[in-house]
Amino acid sequence: MTIAAGRFTKEENDLFDIMDDWLRRDRFVFVGWSGLLLFPCAYFALGGWFTGTTFVTSWYTHGLASSYLEGCNFLTAAVSTPANSLAHSLLLLWGPEAQGDFTRWCQLGGLWTFVALHGAFGLIGFMLRQFELARSVQLRPYNAIAFSAPIAVFVSVFLIYPLGQSGWFFAPSFGVAAIFRFILFFQGFHNWTLNPFHMMGVAGVLGAALLCAIHGATVENTLFEDGDGANTFRAFNPTQAEETYSMVTANRFWSQIFGVAFSNKRWLHFFMLFVPVTGLWMSALGVVGLALNLRAYDFVSQEIRAAEDPEFETFYTKNILLNEGIRAWMAAQDQPHENLIFPEEVLPRGNAL
């Protein structure tokens, strides 16, 4: 019985061992088990985006031209979201909407769901790749944990937000100008810039940029000299094995500048990890809140006083009026299927209109 069990286990492991050996072999481009998810999904997501921006119109879903074929450029081309009438359909090529007709599938916006879902799984595959490689070379998994932040933002903006709304139609289209339009939409309909989660996201991203600049400059400033060259690249050997800069000197410098400084490298680098990752996580949470139509700060007392007193105005009340203008223009332009008609007196006016 023992011999039979042993033989069974050996046969079971043979195929797995062969695949494991091939997938995790040391090569120029590591594949790994995560690569089985990453590479196909990344290939399909990028391929779908290039196909859509090159050939596919958004006339049937948004009433827009969105491809190079129609005269768009890199900044104005996009893979647009499906029509609002299609709600949250996965828009499978073989589904009831397209019924296997590739042209019809593209016209309906099927490429958007294709790119969004493959893109999400591709990003997850890339995070798993970092986990897998870290385990292989016996590193801690903080790279993968950090990469969870942009994944959280992508999933919240492109998937969770439209799931909370009436359909994929309200997600961002995949294009530069399309993303800008989505940002304006977020401001006009959700007052996103006054949302505390957005504030935390901005603080995280800009704070991380500041930390990165300070850290890079400090390390360059405190490098040990090991050459006679006149500049950084000639004077320092990029392959020296020992410590290359002085933490003690850096600590003394910033202690004199600010009165406080990081005392060790672990705390310093953890802080550089913590600031941007937490900021992105918080902004992702904020977008989940917007999916449920949770409101940002409302200073109603200022709105009431501004309505009663023509001479009283704050930056907040001015922004509220701007948001109303955005909504009045965008609702009719953005949602032609609703046949929204606003009286002329409620539309904002300006020199360009």
From Swiss-Prot:
Question: Which residues hold a plastoquinone?
Answer: 215, 262
Residue numbers of Phosphothreonine PTMs: 2
Tell me its EC number(s), please.
1.10.3.9
N-acetylthreonine: residues carrying this PTM: 2
Keywords (A to Z) from UniProt: Acetylation, Chlorophyll, Chloroplast, Chromophore, Electron transport, Iron, Magnesium, Membrane, Metal-binding, Oxidoreductase, Phosphoprotein, Photosynthesis, Photosystem II, Plastid, Thylakoid, Transmembrane, Transmembrane helix, Transport
Q: Give the matching CDD domains.
A: Photosystem-II_D2
Protein's UniProt keywords contain Electron transport: yes
Q: Where does chlorophyll a ChlzD2 bind?
A: 118
Q: Where in the cell is it found?
A: Plastid, Chloroplast thylakoid membrane
Q: What class of enzyme is it?
A: oxidoreductase
GO biological process terms held by the UniProt record: photosynthetic electron transport in photosystem II
Q: How is the cofactor bound?
A: The D1/D2 heterodimer binds P680, chlorophylls that are the primary electron donor of PSII, and subsequent electron acceptors. It shares a non-heme iron and each subunit binds pheophytin, quinone, additional chlorophylls, carotenoids and lipids. There is also a Cl(-1) ion associated with D1 and D2, which is required for oxygen evolution. The PSII complex binds additional chlorophylls, carotenoids and specific lipids.
- Residues noted as binding pheophytin a in the record, renumbered to the chain: 130, 143
Keyword Hydrolase belongs to the record: no
Q: How does it assemble?
A: PSII is composed of 1 copy each of membrane proteins PsbA, PsbB, PsbC, PsbD, PsbE, PsbF, PsbH, PsbI, PsbJ, PsbK, PsbL, PsbM, PsbT, PsbX, PsbY, PsbZ, Psb30/Ycf12, at least 3 peripheral proteins of the oxygen-evolving complex and a large number of cofactors. It forms dimeric complexes.
Q: What else is known?
A: 2 of the reaction center chlorophylls (ChlD1 and ChlD2) are entirely coordinated by water.
Can you say what this protein is called?
Answer: Photosystem II D2 protein
